[in-house]
Amino acid sequence: YGVGFIKNKYVGRTFIQGSQAQRESSVRIKLNAISSTVAGKRVVLVDDSIVRGTTSARTIKLLRDAGAKEVHYRISAPPFAHPCYFGTDIPDEKDLIATGHTVEEIRQIVGADSLGYLSIEHVTQLAIHSKCGFCTGCFTGHYPVPAPNETMDIVYDKPLSQSQTKKRL
C-alpha cells in the first residue's frame, strides 16, 4: 500500500467544468502519479463515481505512464446513467458515459484492466438506516419527485416572465 498520486487541492471537481477542453485541462493539472510507488505494480484505483469518463481515462493513463503493470478500477457507486436534477450539474444523459455503454465498454474506454461498481442494492442497503432521504435517480432513472421538463440552464437563460419556474414561486 502506498500513495500513488500527488493531488493539486486547488483544482475542484473536473466533471462540472463547462467544456470538454476545460475538463481535460483541469485533469492534467489535478493529479501527478508517483512513479516510485506505482512502477511495476498492480494498482487498485478507487473513485466515488465515473460521470463522463474524462478524469478516469486520464488518471489511468497517468498510472500506466508512471509504470503501473495493471490498473484495476473500483467505483463506490452504481453507474451514473441518468441526469441529476438535484445537485449535480448534469442535465443530459448524452453527457454520461454509463448511458449507452456496458461496464465492459466503459472499462475499455477508460483503459482499465478491470472495472467494478458498487451495486444499487448495496448502496440502498448502506443508506437504509439513514435519517435523511436518499435519491437514486441518477443511477436508476426513478426520481423521488417529478423531474423537471426543462434543464435549469435553460430556465435561468430565460427572462423570469417566460419561465415556468415563476409559476412555482
Name each region found by the language model.
Residues 1-169:
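PRPP-associated nucleotide enzymes
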